[in-house]
Design a protein with these regions (language model features):
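N-terminally biased helix-coil "hinge/interface" segments that flank
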Residues: 1-241
Length: 241
């Protein structure tokens, strides 16, 4: 943020499996000491009582799979096709329509210059694979693809609200920095929905997280656990510790 003179930022990293977002206020990254790992609907998770960057992560990325439930409701994620076999358009045997495939159908991704021209998008396979979903929803393939993108966007909007609106921050006071392989595909739609005035796409955004890790300052946090009885003397004991 300092390099581009932007002190208030909402960051969004959209990869193949997940989307991660965080908030920077006045140049300061938000830190959380109440972080849980492996927390999901089936597990209460495990607390990591260490300072970490306050990140919200959801199962929504370029490889997130679109599916229809028993009530004919369309969903996107959290299941992912991963990188192998990956989206159907990769032509590597993928059998489930993903957000990337939907972006290709709607021409949000150039079908003739897929992955910088390194991969020939298998659009015949994409059309055949999305057809059952479209028939179940009674949509055209393009309508189904647009629905997939809208649901993916809504999932990410909810995540962005968790780091901003839900914590008392107005997104209109921030700029959105989007990176990762899919960040640029969805950033403007998300910013429009949240009234974020500026979208920033870094150079080499697909590897921006890795670059940031290499460029970030080293930091060490020293923590000491002290077990003591909660009584009138506890505060003095903790202060001495």
């Amino acid at each position: 943020g300092k390099l581009i003179k932007e002190n208030n930022l909402i960051t969004l990293d959209v990869g193949g499996t997940t989307a991660k977002c965080s908030l920077i206020e006045n140049g300061n990254v938000k830190i959380n000491t109440n972080y849980w790992i492996e927390k999901n609907r089936q597990s209460a998770g495990y607390p990591v009582m260490l300072p970490v960057v306050d990140i919200v992560e959801i199962g929504n990325g370029g490889g997130s799979i679109a599916w229809v439930d028993n009530y004919d409701k369309l969903h996107v994620g959290p299941q992912s096709a991963g990188a192998d076999p990956g989206p159907v358009s990769y032509g590597k045997g993928g059998t489930s329509i993903t957000t990337t495939d939907a972006n290709l159908i709607t021409n949000r991704i150039n079908q003739n210059y897929f992955c910088g021209g390194e991969i020939k998008a298998d659009m015949d396979a994409v059309s055949k694979t999305i057809e059952p979903l479209s028939k179940k929803l009674k949509f055209t393939n393009e309508e189904t693809a647009r629905g997939i993108i809208r649901i993916a966007n809504n999932n990410m909007i909810n995540a962005l609200k968790l780091v901003s609106v839900n914590k008392g921050y107005d997104p209109r006071d921030f700029s959105l920095v989007a990176f990762g392989g899919g960040g640029g595909m969805h950033a403007t739609s998300l910013a429009k929905e949240l009234n974020i005035p500026k979208v920033i796409i870094p150079v080499n955004s697909s590897v921006f997280s890795a670059w940031g890790m290499l460029m970030s300052d080293l930091r060490r946090d020293y923590i000491l656990t002290k077990l003591t009885t909660m009584n009138d003397q506890a505060i003095d004991i903790l202060n001495k510790t």
